[in-house]
């Protein structure tokens, strides 16, 4: 079962197979020194104390030197076994985490709507560690402990032949299988509790991630006590589940030891009844103990396998998730892109909830198209289909007449720049954050993009200029500054298609004015989709698509739509009233 379940992942040991083999080899040396060496020494050393005919001179020195020799072999073999296994284990853990992370990078956005960030972090960091333990430490134990057991049993067979105590030896060996009985009974319980504990660990990570990502909101709404209670409840639930796992895990060793004690006592009773010599009794009891010790450790291995199996189930959920936005088998090459986008009878749904229903539209090259409508009408979904964040259920989306599913995702997305409503910056320098759209850009190119985005002046005002660290998610910059860096990214990419997800909706008037000026420059000579929440954003749009209930119910200029479309008129008038009351630009409700 172990090989069948974990076998496919042993390939991760291939780059460190030499170190892994060395570790196993030294483990066998340590096992042989423990399983047969110690009982053998005891058999010959007991007569030194009990016999009148004691060895003398060199014979005594050689006999006594066997003690440090056996312990040296055992200790050195154990150390080198542990070192090489740790080396192989860390390499496997590194590769496992990279493998899972790489898979996550290629999963569609829909996957992240169904799985929270904290749980995914737990799978990448925690569950990979459990799998690494199974692949390295378990295999090590499955080689080393049986070798100790076989060595000890081999010594018992040797004594059986040399001392003619076949009956006693059979009785002694018959007690060994009794130690295996608790392993299976407890293993099933550990598997169940481990699955629950690992799932709860993911939930705890999610609570922590949400809290740390919403520090301002927690303070602003006095949610500290609520958040402490949430975190405490999650920690306590994990504690209860982990405690149950530990209870079953740690129960196994005492049960095996108790069984061992009864078995040794029974064997000693039989030995006394048969008048077996003290040195033989001592060596037999030592050999029997060396049999029970690996059985106890193998019981622990069984528990480790159960825990790793629960982790493997969670990892394979990620690894075996199908990419619902697959690459084309033979992608067509992209040449000079003009930017013509066509939606042909497109239908799309989120979990059977229709978001777009048989939508058809044509966007000419270099046109700026504003997408307006009530919340949930389909504006964002429409824009997200262009870079293939999702795939249509029915119909097609074409770029310059080519179905975008026939293009490689990398080629398609290289032609599209995106400026989001809340632009995320990475914890790096300003220059490197702008370079995300063109990693090999020179500093002069970065500065030129920043100038076009009206960002150069405020960047130069920082002491470190373009080498200024922005902090986690850009926390050291204002909202307007973050947005202008995101716009600079888009300028640097210089893509023929740009998607603007209302980048001015949460800004003050001054920041909005600067960003509007930058966006006007960004829209020139490009095909632009503007997801509009503020009607001030669409002043320069060539056409406006009005969405309602997953359909485009009208399209035209502002003047045409205001006169002919009741929904558009209602949305605009509602924002106009808001503008009059707040002395600001209209914002969509």
Regions found by a protein language model. Give the residues of each.
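Transmembrane helix-loop-helix hairpins at lipid-water interfaces of multipass membrane proteins
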Residues: 2, 20-80, 84, 157-170, ...
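A short amphipathic helical element positioned immediately N-terminal to and/or at the very start
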Residues: 2-17, 120
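An intracellular "coupling" helix at the cytosolic face of ABC transporter transmembrane type-1 domains
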Residues: 14-18, 109-110, 126-135, 139, ...
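Hydrophobic alpha-helical transmembrane bundles that constitute the permease/transmembrane domains
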Residues: 28-36, 71-79, 131-134, 138-153, ...
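Helix-loop-helix
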Residues: 51-52, 155-177, 248-313, 318-319
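Cytoplasmic coupling helices
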Residues: 83-102, 116, 143, 171-216, ...
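Short active-site loops of ABC-family nucleotide-binding domains
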Residues: 90, 110, 118, 122, ...
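ABC-type nucleotide-binding domain
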Residues: 335-589
């Amino acid at each position: 079962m172990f090989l069948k379940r974990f076998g496919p992942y042993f390939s991760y040991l291939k780059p460190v197979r030499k170190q892994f083999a060395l570790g196993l080899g030294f483990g066998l040396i340590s096992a042989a020194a423990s399983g047969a060496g110690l009982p053998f020494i005891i058999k010959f050393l007991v007569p030194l104390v009990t016999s009148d005919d004691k060895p003398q001179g060199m014979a005594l020195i050689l006999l006594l030197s066997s003690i440090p020799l056996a312990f040296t072999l055992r200790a050195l073999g154990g150390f080198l076994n542990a070192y090489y296994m740790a080396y192989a284990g860390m390499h496997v853990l590194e590769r496992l985490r990279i493998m899972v992370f790489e898979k996550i990078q290629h999963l569609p956005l829909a996957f992240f709507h169904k799985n929270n960030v904290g749980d995914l972090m737990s799978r990448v960091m925690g569950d990979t560690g459990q799998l690494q333990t199974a692949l390295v430490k378990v295999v090590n134990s499955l080689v080393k402990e049986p070798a100790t057991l076989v060595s000890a049993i081999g010594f018992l067979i040797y004594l059986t032949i040399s001392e003619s105590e076949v009956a006693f030896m059979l009785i002694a060996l018959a007690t060994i299988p009794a130690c295996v009985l608790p392993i299976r009974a407890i293993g099933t319980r550990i598997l169940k509790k481990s699955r629950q504990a690992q799932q709860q660990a993911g939930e705890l990570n999610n609570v922590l991630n949400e809290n740390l990502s919403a520090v301002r909101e927690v303070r602003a709404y006095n949610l500290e006590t609520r958040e402490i209670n949430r975190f405490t409840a999650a920690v306590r639930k994990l504690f209860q589940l982990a405690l149950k796992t530990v209870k079953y895990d740690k129960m196994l060793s005492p049960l095996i030891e108790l069984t061992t004690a009864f078995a040794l006592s029974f064997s000693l009773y039989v030995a006394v009844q048969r008048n077996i010599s003290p040195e033989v009794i001592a060596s037999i009891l030592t050999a029997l103990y060396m049999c029970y010790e690996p059985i106890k450790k193998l019981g622990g291995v069984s528990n480790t396998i159960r825990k790793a199996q629960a982790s493997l189930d969670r990892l394979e959920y990620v690894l075996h998730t199908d990419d619902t936005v697959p690459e084309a088998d033979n992608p067509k090459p992209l040449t000079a892109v003009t930017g013509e986008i066509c939606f042909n009878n497109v239908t799309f749904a989120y979990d059977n909830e229709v978001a777009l229903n048989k939508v058809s539209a044509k966007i000419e090259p270099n046109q700026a198209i504003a997408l307006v409508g009530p919340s949930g009408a389909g504006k964002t979904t429409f824009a997200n289909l262009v870079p293939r964040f999702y795939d249509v259920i029915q119909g097609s989306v074409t770029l310059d007449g080519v179905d975008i599913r026939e293009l490689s995702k990398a080629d398609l997305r290289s032609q599209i720049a995106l400026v989001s409503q809340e632009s995320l910056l990475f914890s790096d320098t300003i220059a490197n954050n702008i370079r995300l759209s063109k990693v090999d850009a020179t500093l002069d190119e970065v500065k030129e993009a920043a100038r076009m985005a009206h960002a150069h002046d405020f960047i130069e005002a920082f002491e470190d200029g373009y080498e200024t660290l922005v902090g986690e998610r850009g926390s050291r910059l204002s909202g307007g500054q973050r947005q202008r860096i995101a716009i600079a990214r888009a300028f640097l990419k210089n893509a023929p298609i740009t998607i603007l997800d209302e980048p001015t909706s949460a800004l003050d008037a001054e920041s909005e004015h600067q960003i509007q000026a930058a966006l006007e420059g960004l829209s020139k000579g490009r095909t632009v989709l503007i997801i509009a929440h503020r009607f001030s954003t669409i002043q320069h749009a060539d056409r406006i698509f009005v969405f309602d209930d997953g359909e485009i119910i009208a399209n035209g200029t502002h003047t045409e739509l205001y006169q002919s479309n009741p929904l558009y008129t209602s949305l605009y008038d509602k924002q106009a009233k808001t503008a009059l009351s707040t002395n600001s630009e209209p914002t969509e409700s």
